[in-house]
A protein has these predicted regions:
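Short acidic active-site motifs
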Residues: 119-120, 142
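Active-site-proximal region of nucleotide-activated glycan assembly enzymes
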Residues: 1-36
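Catalytic binding pocket for nucleotide-activated donors in carbohydrate/polymer assembly enzymes
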Residues: 125-126, 130, 134-219
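Generic beta-strand/beta-sheet core signal
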Residues: 1, 54, 83, 112-114, ...
């Protein structure tokens, strides 16, 4: 699509890059179950800001975790929820050590267990005020779920495919707030969204409106565009023979 690879990316690929007009993936929404998480269960006061990161463990990079802790430090009335498939002890040690090195109390971290069904996982996302993306390996499915649930997201954009997934998805739902091109912008957006409930509400409204208009939530349209691309590829192949 126009976003997931930079314009100069072709030199790094032996295959010819073929750009679809809007998005390289689309889904017709998600099933959402009944939430099983409440703030009081996690001993989190109702008047605080909750950040969440739900990517799988291999996407966690210490540098990105450090930026997330810097956000927490600048938003004192905040907590950070961490979930995702990973070795529990390793993840807790990673976050706890970096939090302490950045002057953030480990008591503000919560490590969430896995749930029985994906629909429950999505419902539980509603506990978060802001989702913080991973870098240099962004979320993909987790980002789509976040956008579908209408939760503001902060993502750091890089040069490679895996660091531009969330950027492309956000552009396709018409949300630029939270897209960061530098580490500094990532922290700035995280802090700003944590401190501005009105902005969070505006972004959430945009995301929910996008369910009716965005190509990201229109699998039929995407399929037609993909089929058209296949025909164009075949035509070019035949003409070049």
């Amino acid at each position: 699509d126009p976003y997931v690879l930079p314009e100069n990316a072709q030199e790094y690929y032996s295959e010819t890059i073929w750009r679809l007009p809007q998005t390289y993936v689309a889904v017709d929404g998600f099933e959402v179950g009944v939430p099983t998480l409440r703030r009081d269960q996690l001993e989190i006061p109702l008047d605080t800001v909750v950040y969440l990161s739900g990517q799988t463990g291999f996407k966690r990079h210490p540098d990105a975790v450090r930026l997330q802790m810097q956000i927490l430090k600048q938003v004192p009335n905040s907590y950070f929820l961490v979930k995702g498939l990973a070795d529990e002890n390793s993840i807790q040690q990673l976050f706890t050590q970096i939090a302490e090195s950045e002057g953030v109390e480990a008591s503000r971290l919560r490590f969430l267990p896995r749930v029985s069904h994906e629909s429950v996982h999505r419902a539980n996302l509603a506990i978060a005020d802001v989702v913080l993306d991973t870098y240099p390996y962004n979320g993909a499915t987790t980002t789509l779920e976040t956008l579908w649930m209408g939760i503001p997201l902060v993502t750091r954009v890089g040069q490679q495919f895996s660091a531009r997934n969330s950027y492309g998805f956000m552009m396709n739902v018409g949300v630029t707030e939270g897209i960061a091109w530098t580490d500094e912008e990532y922290v700035e957006w995280g802090v700003r969204l944590g401190k501005d409930p009105s902005l969070r509400q505006q972004i959430s409204w945009k995301m929910r409106q996008s369910r009716q208009t965005s190509p990201l939530w229109n699998a039929k349209q995407f399929t037609q565009e993909m089929e058209k691309a296949y025909k164009q590829m075949w035509r070019r192949y035949v003409e070049d023979k």
